Every structure is written in C-alpha cells, then in structure tokens.
From Swiss-Prot:
Gene Ontology molecular-function annotations: ATP binding; endonuclease activity; metal ion binding; pyruvate, water dikinase activity
DOD-type homing endonuclease domain segment(s): 536-670
Domain-level remarks: The N-terminal domain contains the ATP/Pi binding site, the central domain the pyrophosphate/phosphate carrier histidine, and the C-terminal domain the pyruvate binding site.
GO biological processes: gluconeogenesis; intein-mediated protein splicing
UniProt enzyme class: transferase
Protein name: Probable phosphoenolpyruvate synthase
Entry keyword annotation includes ATP-binding: yes
Known role: Catalyzes the phosphorylation of pyruvate to phosphoenolpyruvate.
Positions bound to Mg(2+): 1061, 1086
Gene name linked to the record: ppsA
Protein modification: This protein undergoes a protein self splicing that involves a post-translational excision of the intervening region (intein) followed by peptide ligation.
Length: 1188
C-alpha cells in the first residue's frame, strides 16, 4: 500500500492493491474495492487492479479547498425539486472536475498505473475506472449505480483525469438524493476509485445467488448477453435469463431473449453499441456447461461471504472473470405474501415481460418520457416508461409498480432539422450536443397565444423505429418536400375548433391538416453594429465570397455579370465598400462576368463575419437589418418574376446562405418557398409582403410592382372545417359552403372579406376569432404519406409549463415548418424495490395514461383493470383528441375533504387546494383526538395528521395546499370512539367549533401546527395555514402566539390566512388585515346562514337558504375589494365557488382564486375564462368610448 505523509505528519493511504484489501476495508477502498480485494484473496478469478483510496479523495477535497464551496451549494437544497437538484449537481461536479489534482496524488496514481502495466505485460494497459463509495454496498441502503464508471481508459494521464471524474460522481443528482433520503452526511461518505484491467468480454452479465424475484434461496439466477457487460448492468440490453437449482446445479428454467444490440470495443478502444448479428440475436449466450461452471463460482462466492450476493461477470478467451460482488440489498424481510397464480386471476392480460421485482399492485398508468417529468407520478401510480434510471428514484418511491419496454417510439429522422439558437441543426446533431451537456433553445409554439416562442431543450433521445415519410403538398400532390416521422407521433391539430393532440397515423387516415408557422421571433438583439453594412453583406455574398488563409479573412471577392441593368447597382456596391475602407478592383472578366476584389482588412473582417454567421445573424438582428440583408441578396442575384414574386438564386451547396435567407424571411413574416432547379441551383421565392424588401432594393424598383395585375397570394391559409366549424352555419354566394364541405383552405384576408358582407346573428363572435387567427403565427398545411421505412429516430424534450406547450417546430427537406409535440422517450435501467415488469417491448404503446392496470412483478404480467375485473367488450379505437388547457388569470383551486381523493383532485388540473379540511382526516381515524392524546400520546396524533396532509401536499406539489385547522361541530365528534363526553348542543353550527374550540383545546391545535411544521421541513413548502370561524382580531393574535410557540412564524415562515364565514369578520375585515394576514378565504356556506339566519341543515327552512342573497353578495364584494386595496389575496371555498352565476360576479370584483368541488373544477374554469374575457372586452369598449 502506497502511504504518503502530509505536511502535518499524518499518514495518507493513496493507493491500495487488491492483495492488501478485504471486506473490512470499505472505509478505505469503498464497497467495490473492498469486495474485489476479498474475492482476490479468496482465490476467485478477478482481473488485477489497484484502488485510489478514500483518503486520496479526502486529500483532494481538502487540498483544493472545495469543501466549503460544496457545502454552500448544498445548503438549503430541496432534493425533491428536480431542477434545483440537477443544477446543484452540475455546479459541484464542475468544481471538482476543473480543480487541479494535487501533485503528490497525481504522481501516486501514475506510479500505480505503470506498475499495473508491468503486471499485465503491456506498455499501456486498457482499464476501467470505477467509482467505489464508502457507503455504496451497505445492506441498509443500496447506493449502487449512483456513481460513474469509465471504460476503455488508456494512458497514465487519462487515468488521473478519470479518477477525478469519479470523485465528482459522488455528487450526481441521484447520489445527493439518496444520501439525503438515507440520512448520510455528504462529507462522511467518501469515494474511492478502482482502476482495473478491462476484460474485453465476448459475453457478460450478472448473477444473483438467490432468486431476487421469487426470493427463492434454493435458486441462482444468471443473466447473460453478448459483448461487454455494460448493457446488462444498465438494462439497455434484454439478457438471457437462466435459473439454476443450487443443490443439483440443474438448469430449471431458461428465458432466451432477442438481443438486438451489444456493447463492444472498437479499434480505438472506445465502447460502442452495434447490432447483434442476425444468427446470434436469438441464440443462447452461455452453453449449459458454461452456465453450470459459472453457477459453481457463484456458490463459492456466496459461501465465502456467507450471504446472498449480486455478482458482475465477464467471459473472455474461455475464462470467466468476476468483476464485482456485493450483497443483495433488496431482499424483503419477514413473511412472504401469498402469490397469486396466473390461472386464478380473471382478468385480461395486456402485456407479458420479465418479472424484475416481486409483488402485485394495482394503480393508474402514468407514462413518463424522461426524468424531467417525474413529478407527474403520484403516490400509488403505475410508472410506465421505456426504461428507468436511478435518476427517477423520487418517482419510483411513489409508484406502486413499474413497467418498462426496451424503448418506446421516439419521433423524427436524424437528418431532419430544427431551428435552434445556433441556427438549423439536424436532430442527430442536437442529440449529441444535448447529451454532452450543451444548452440549446428551439423554436416552438405557445399553445395559448398561438405565437411562436423560443424554448429550452432539456433532454434528447434516439432509437430505431418504423417511420412514415410524409410530404407537404399544396396544389400539386407530387411533392419532394418530405420528412420522416414515427406514425404515433402527436401533432397539435385543430379538431372541432379546439387545439388537440392527434397521432400522425390518424392525421393521414382522416385527411386532417396540420399547423405551420409564418413568423420567427428574435432571440435577442446583438448585431446593431452591423446595421450599416447589412445591405452590402447581402449584395456581396449573393454571388461572391470571402477568401481566407488559415481561417482568417484576407480579401473579398464580388462577382456580377456586366449588364446595363446592373451597372448602377455595381457602382453603388463599390461605393459602399469604400465607406468601410475598401476598394473593389476588377481582377477578371470572362464572358462578361466580372470579378472584383478588395484586400483591405476591415471590409474583409466585417464581410467575413457576416459570411460565417449568415445562418444565425437573422435570429439576432432587427427586422430593418434583416430586410437590408435580404434586399442585398435580391439585387445581387435575384429578380421580380412575371409571377409577381421575388426570386433569389443560390448554389444548392451554399446551405448556410440558404438557411440564413429562409430564417430572415420568416423573421419578417414572409413565407418563403424553396425549389431546386436540377441539382446545382436553389431558388428561394416568395410573393407576400413584397414591399418590405422592395422598398430597400436598389436595382429592382418598388414601382415595378405596378406592372403586375395579379394580386399577391394570400399566404395565411386556414382549414375552416377544423379551425372554424361554426362557419358551416354561414355562407356567402356558395363560397364558404363549398370551402367547408370540400375541406378546402381559404386565405384569412379573403375570409374576412366574405364575412364583412354577412349580416347574421353570431357572425361578430366569429369575426373576433378570425382576428385572433390573423394576428397569430400559424396557418394550415396539408400532408400525405409518400413512403414508409425503418430506421433511427430522435426526439427532444423542451421545458414547458403544460403539456400543450411541450412542442417544437421541425423542418422538412425544403424548409417547411411543422409544429409537433414531444413524444415518448426515456433512458433504460432496471430498478428494484417495487413490483416491476421489464422487457415488455410495447408497454408504452399498449398502455395509456389514466388506465387502471394490475402489475404482477413476479410473473411479469400486466393485467387490465383490477385483477378481479374482466372487460367484456373492447371499445372501437377512434382518433383521440385532448383539449388544450384553459389558462386563466384567476386561479381555480379545488376543495379536498379526504386525503384518499387527492390524486383524483390533482388530476383535475386545479391550481391548488383552496380548502383542505382537517376534521375529515380526524373523523377518518375513527377515534376522538382527545382519546388519541390520552392513550397514545402527542406523537401519534401528529403522525396521523402528517400522513393525511402529506398525501395531499405531495399530490399537488408544488401547487399550494391551504390547510384549515380543526372545525368539527360537537355532533360530529360525538360519534367517534371516546366522543361520549362531547357536549350536547341544540345548534352545534352556532356552538363550540372553529377557532373558539381550537383556542380552548390548545394541545390539539399545537399537534396540527407541529404536523405542518415537520412537513414543511420535509420539503412540502406548498402547505399554508388557515383558521376558521374568526370573529375578532384577538383570535388571530392568540393563534399567532401559539404558532410561534411551536416554531412557526406566521406570514414569514408560512403563508397564514383566515376564513371569513361570519358577518362580523366581513364587516371588520380591515382590522384583521392590520393584525397581519396573507390571505382570506370566503366560507360562503356559513356566511350565508349567519347573514340570513337560516340553519342550512334544518329541512323546514333550508329551501330559503340562498348563497346569492343580496346581503351575502354585498358582504363578499366588500371583503374582496377591501383586500384588493391592501394587497391581500382572496379566495372562496364555499359551495358558491361551484356556482357559475356567482363565480362571474366574483371574477368581476377581482377575486384571486375560486375553489370548487372536484366535479366542478372544469366547469368553473370555463366560467372564469369566459368572465375574464368579458371583463377585458368591456374595459376595452369603455376605454374606446372615453377616447371618442
């Protein structure tokens, strides 16, 4: 063992060899290193290796001074916030990887590597550098897979580099998450790095010395695949599975998987994924004799360790090697549950795969595309994805079961392009950049405003899949303007006037139009310094270029045909060059084509910059600058054709120029078309907004337009049959009827002209909708299927607030933009702990969000519904459409009585919980809270409250959840166990309840407050507190004092509000505001009965109970307007919040949120949206009248 003494005289063990290590050395070598040493010394076949020790890691952290910086980043981190966790990890890893390795440690690693090379008889041995955490393989908490492994590392300096990367992998998002969850101090867990000779495996896999699925201790399970073991360990390859009887070594079961891909080393020593040869795809990887030989080694390993082991193995040149062994940490303790037999279950089997973790669970399907969507999964859901990774741990902990396939259908061909903030990039280029951690933005559509916007790309995926080749066509259906997309890819499409999600195959089958865009917004302005030279840049580059030497621009060449029509233009370009210090001289004249040149530095650098960045400049330039640039191209090599359109000609190989022109024209709201003449010439042409360009051209005059009689083509065409179905009730001289019936497109301007001549009820509303469409950035195009094949497809995931904004714009071969949604995609892994079925191949295709399924993790079966239910009939599959979300300024929340309905309530899309009733949680316990305190103690009541509140807070996180303290009347508590002593009141609704009772039973109130405090400390910062039935500010003051006693500072640590349920509270609302509150919630149920003196539970008078009584509404209006004046938020949580006609008034008065019952959320959201629109319209009308 190499021991270094530091400046303080402490002994530092930097390097340890396997013969120096045993299982007792986890604190020195980490789990992997200690285990390898144990196996080496037990005489097991292990490749030679050395370990860079945990002391070395600590030395590195100390000498580089990184500890304080890391602590600062981790301070206050909420690990349940996926974005925050990921960002913290990136910052820490960057700090570690960019730090300078201490020289003494660097030399120690190099010396050890050179010694390993001597042992292996190689000049530079190829090694694997594997992280080995000091808490990694402890039985209490599986840390496996949380740190990194690097294969095919060669050379001493590279080993040093990748050891440092291993150090940084101690702070991956999932490692940070696990340590927080398991209560490990981040700096008490150290990391070692194992540097081991890499076995170039012909076949490899894993072995479990106990069947981890059935937990049968008499069985040993081997998984095997072709090539390196990386595919099996990560789960990206479906392995063969062999089950061996440990007593007889009889092979009792085999599952021979179809193995599509394998990991191999290429000639450069790098790992790559290749296709398995056809004759090996379904061939058994290990022979029966090899299975038994490996099983014997496994038995020896288990015997040596004295416990069930999880072993990684490899096979090279006729010999097995053990790469790693660790205890199986996932075996359940205690009595096993009785397993259901497949034949006993009366349910339809939807899928079969390989059982990966035992157990049976029923729940709602939630399909996850990637780790950014893990918050979608709630407690008890069935997580369905292509493949899972340890990064999905937060979602897995909530899931009742997990179902995976080997890869769902991602979306777009690799050569298709998207427009990013770096210009046009192919999908396969974007994939590489994103996977390398590059930040990119992509053009997309805002589903609410129908305006284009830039969106951040947060992930990318790829695989192979079936692809449709679709062509964009207009009048001529024979199109070469194509793109390849998977048939189940979803597009935003108008169906019956609503923006909807429709699969490509359904679009084709039903001849639906899709959306294109006619405008690209600027990302940011940064080329104002080029404003004066944009025209010159376009003119020169239209048919010229910049000569470079060693990449630097040294001269400008400008080529033009010497015609009478171009003489003035050429002279003006010469004059413009002189203005920036250049001087064009003629250097050649062939067939009347003259080439001019200037070798001056400034024009060469300026025009050279424009040439290099021509494809991205339009993204960052103003419209005036872009118009000048394009005008230069038009004058230089363009014309105004007889078809009354402008044409620009470019060599088809000048891709950057073509793309710059395309982007520039869209930036100006001009829709360009691209056509190729033969293979060498590209023509970019357009015939709308011609004046924008022609008023800036110098050769082609604007007044030439007068020579053309043909009107400009109306480019914004829409499919009224899909977007404006209400037009079927209107017509103008048969035109609209024909357009609608035959699904023809019509120009928006022409449609406006027709409708202006129609005088009929309802037409004004349609005109308003058309106005919005005219101001939008969308129009309709038609597509058709022209071919089909199988090949690579790619997908990106964009950051968005809601699912309809998870879209982006993809471009065809001829640069026609089409709006598409994100599709299903994720990364692979196998996961433990909950019922899990892997290798189904088609889970993400067969299962749908919202389906109820039962997962049998041992049998590897997914059943339809609950296992006792059998569906008699299958519904005919139709085009499935989803309505776009309605966005409102007024929040629409939901009332929740019981934690059990939290998932259903959250699924409504509500903006939060406006009222979470404490009393229903208490009643659900079946025992009086006083009895719980007396018999079980304070902790029992706190835990019971936490459990209920947590379910709701978790389901809605990060949306707010407003918890109302206990408000149960005495008659409700009397029925509980221990409730015999509840006082008998003639009218409990006017009796001992609400804040009166809370302040009389402070010990129960404190339990509620302590439960909330602990939950907020767990990370549920979305919980708010509200007190009921207040009548005087003194009550608020007293509750605040009690909150401080339990460690909660109202209005500072936690949002704090009151229920306004009494006329007293409504009338003196300003006094409550002065006392200090964050929000008010109107409880109209009680407010109504107290205002009009009617007991709503009394059948004799309940018919007179009216929430819209003028006196009640007057009090409500007074509260809302008073609070608004003081900046206090208002909400309503009574039944009135579910009454549309009352909600209209609330919105008009300015209420901040409305909390409705679960079944009324959708209706109320529509009422709120309609009312908000009406309020805005009335304001506009009023303003207009006042101006007039």
């Amino acid at each position: 063992m190499l021991i270094i003494q530091n400046t303080k005289g402490d002994s530092m063990k930097f390097i340890a060899w396997l013969d120096e290590l045993s299982n007792k050395d986890v604190d020195i070598a980490g789990g992997k290193g200690a285990s390898l040493g144990e196996m080496w010394n037990a005489g097991l076949p292990v490749p030679p290796a050395f370990v860079v020790t945990a002391d070395a890691y600590r030395h590195f952290i100390k000498e580089t001074g990184l500890m304080d910086k890391i602590r600062e980043i981790l301070s206050g981190l909420d690990v349940n916030d996926t974005d925050a966790l990921t960002n913290a990890s990136k910052k820490i890893r960057k700090l570690i990887e960019e730090a300078e390795m201490p020289e003494d440690l660097r030399l120690a690693i190099i010396e050890a590597y050179n010694k390993l090379c001597e042992m292996c008889g190689e000049d530079e041995v190829t090694v694997a550098v594997r992280s080995s955490a000091t808490a990694e393989d402890l039985p209490e908490a599986s840390f496996a897979g949380q740190q990194d492994t690097y294969l095919n590392i060669k050379g001493a300096e590279n080993v040093v580099k990748y050891v440092q990367k291993c150090f940084s992998s101690l702070f991956t998002p999932r490692a940070i998450f696990y340590r927080e969850q398991q209560g490990f101090d981040h700096f008490k867990v150290a990391l070692a790095a194992v540097v081991q000779k890499l076995v170039n495996a012909e076949k490899a896999g894993v072995m479990f010395t106990v069947n981890p699925i059935s937990e049968n201790y008499d069985e040993l399970v081997i998984e095997a695949a072709w090539g390196l073991g990386e595919g099996v360990v990560s789960g990206s390859v479906s392995p063969d599975t062999y089950i061996v009887n440990k007593k007889t070594l009889e092979i009792v079961d085999k599952h021979i998987a179809r193995k599509e891909t394998m990991f191999v080393k290429d000639e450069k020593g790098e790992t790559k994924v290749v296709e398995v040869p056809d004759d090996m795809k379904e061939k058994q990887v290990l022979s029966d004799d090899e299975i038994k030989e490996l099983a014997k080694i496994g038995l020896n390993i288990e015997k040596h360790y004295g416990k069930p082991m999880d072993v990684e193995w490899a096979y090279e040149k006729g010999k097995f090697y053990m790469l790693q062994a660790r205890p199986i940490t996932t075996l359940k303790k205690g009595k096993k549950e009785k397993k259901a037999k497949e034949e006993d279950i009366e349910a339809k089997i939807l899928l079969k795969g390989i059982g990966a973790s035992p157990g049976i669970a029923t729940g709602v399907v939630k399909i996850i595309h990637d780790v950014s969507e893990i918050d979608k999964v709630k407690e008890g859901d069935i997580l369905v994805t292509e493949m899972t990774t340890p990064d999905m741990v937060p979602a897995m902990k909530k899931a009742a079961a997990i179902v995976t396939d080997e890869g769902g259908l991602t979306c777009i061909e690799g050569d298709a392009k998207i427009l990013t903030d770096r210009g046009f990039l192919k999908m396969k280029e974007v994939y590489k950049l994103v996977k390398n951690g590059e930040k990119l933005k992509v053009l997309g559509l805002n589903a609410e405003t129908l305006k284009t916007e830039w969106k951040e790309i947060i992930d990318a995926q790829k695989r192979e899949a079936r692809r449709y080749e679709i062509g964009v066509y207009r009048k001529n259906k024979n199109t070469k303007d194509t793109i390849k997309i998977t048939p189940d890819h979803k597009f935003p499409v108008f169906v019956n006037g609503e923006l909807s999600k429709v699969q490509l195959c359904d679009i084709i089958d039903n001849n639906l139009s899709v959306l294109s865009i006619d405008y690209i917004p600027m990302i940011e302005e940064k080329y104002e310094s080029l404003a004066e030279v944009m025209y010159l840049g376009g003119a020169v580059l239209s048919d010229g270029h910049i000569v470079r030497r060693n990449g630097k621009p040294i001269r400008v060449r400008f080529t033009q045909k010497d015609t009478e029509e171009k003489k003035d233009f050429i002279e003006k370009v010469k004059g413009d060059v002189k203005l920036i210090g250049g001087n064009f001289i003629e250097i050649s004249n062939r067939n009347n084509v003259i080439e001019y040149q200037t070798s001056r530095k400034i024009p060469s650098e300026i025009l050279g910059f424009i040439e290099v960045n021509i494809n991205t400049i339009p993204l960052y330039a103003t419209k005036d600058e872009i118009a000048d640039l394009i005008a230069g191209f038009v004058d230089g090599d363009g014309c105004l054709s007889g078809k009354r359109r402008v044409e620009i000609y470019q060599n088809s190989s000048h891709i950057k120029k073509i793309e710059g022109l395309i982007v520039g024209l869209y930036r100006l709201g001009i829709i360009p078309r691209l056509r190729y003449k033969r293979s060498s010439t590209a023509t970019i042409y357009f015939n709308n907004n011609l004046e924008t360009i022609l008023q800036r051209t110098r050769r082609i005059k604007l007044d030439k337009l007068k020579e053309f009689k043909k009107p400009v083509e109306d480019k914004k065409l829409i499919d009224i049959s899909q977007i404006l179905p209400e037009l079927k009730e209107f017509d103008y001289k048969g035109y609209l009827y024909k357009t609608y019936k035959e699904k023809l497109f019509i120009g928006i301007n022409k449609l406006e002209e027709y409708l202006s001549k129609i005088d009929k009820d309802g037409i004004e509303r349609i005109k308003q909708k058309i106005k919005l469409l005219k101001e939008s950035d969308i129009y309709s195009i038609r597509i058709k299927k022209v071919g089909e094949d199988y090949g690579e497809v790619y997908n990106i995931t964009v950051k968005a607030e809601n699912e309809f904004n998870h879209n982006y714009v993809v471009w065809t071969k001829h640069y026609t933009p089409i709006v598409v949604f994100n599709c299903h995609a994720a990364i692979v892994s196998r996961e433990l702990g909950t019922p899990c079925v892997v290798g189904t191949k088609k889970a993400t295709k067969v299962l749908k969000d919202g389906m109820i399924v039962t997962v049998d993790g041992e049998k590897g079966i997914v059943y339809e519904g609950e296992i006792k239910k059998v569906e008699e009939k299958e519904k005919k599959q139709e085009v499935v459409v989803q309505q776009a979300p309605i966005i409102t300024a007024t929040e629409v929340k939901v009332n929740v009585s019981m934690p059990e309905v939290a998932e259903r309530a959250a699924a409504t899309g509500a903006d939060g919980v406006g009222l979470l009733r404490a009393e229903h949680m208490i009643l659900g316990l079946g025992k009086h809270p006083r009895k719980i305190l007396e018999e079980e103690g304070e902790e029992a009541l706190i835990e019971a409250l936490m459990e209920g509140i947590r379910k709701v807070a978790d389901a809605f996180y990060p949306r707010p959840v407003t918890y109302r303290t206990l408000d149960a009347p005495t008659d409700e508590f009397r029925g509980l166990e221990g409730g015999e002593n509840e006082p008998i009141e003639h009218n409990p609704m006017l009796g001992w309840r609400g804040i009166r009772r809370d302040l009389d039973e402070v010990d129960i109130l404190k339990c509620e407050l302590k439960a909330i405090k602990r939950l907020r400390e767990e990370g549920y910062k979305n919980i708010e507190i509200m007190i009921p039935l207040v009548t005087h500010p003194d009550e608020v003051r007293r509750v605040k004092e009690i909150m401080r006693e339990v460690g909660l500072e109202p209005c500072k640590d936690i949002p704090f509000g009151i229920m306004v349920e009494t006329p007293a509270a409504a009338l003196i609302i300003e006094d409550f505001i002065k006392e200090g509150i964050n929000f008010v919630s109107l409880g109209t149920n009680d407010l109504t009965q107290y205002t009009i003196a009617i007991d709503r539970n009394n059948e004799l008078v309940s018919k007179y109970y009216k929430e819209d009584h003028p006196a009640v509404l007057k009090l409500v209006e007074h509260v809302i307007k008073t609070c608004k004046k003081h900046g206090i938020k208002t909400s309503i949580c009574g039944q009135a919040g579910s009454r549309p006609h009352i909600v209209e008034k609330l919105v008009e008065w300015g209420i901040d949120s409305v909390s409705a019952n679960i079944d009324a959320v959708e209706t109320i959201r529509r009422v709120v949206a309609r009312t908000e629109q009406k309020v805005i319209l009335n304001y506009i009308r009023k303003s207009y009248v006042e101006r007039e």
